[in-house]
């Protein structure tokens, strides 16, 4: 009697297209007002995955659901990648996946803003991050935001500020 396995989880990276990754396990947390945090164990027939390129590439983790329901999708960047071993022609990897916004938690800085509108302050802060660029859309709800005389960011991350 043959058994067919149905894939329930997917890890997708533009780096690995010829021989895909297969999820063997994961742990993680996600919730309202919280950045998700997934540790994903993978297996791949390619033992020569360029982990440097994998770290720099946007990845997606999907939890597939029954029927025609859309999968739960978590997109972000690997914060850490390890090759854990090699056995019987397969390489085992561990990936720590964080959302793109997580990168904004990695740098503390200080800045002073004089007579600048909120929109201008936000644009300046986000555009100042040259060591990591990420696609974003800048939208504020209707209304006029005043330009405070003085605003300061002191030893805060961009995410916290």
Spans of model-derived segments:
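Amphipathic alpha-helical and helix-coil boundary elements used as assembly
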Residues: 1-161
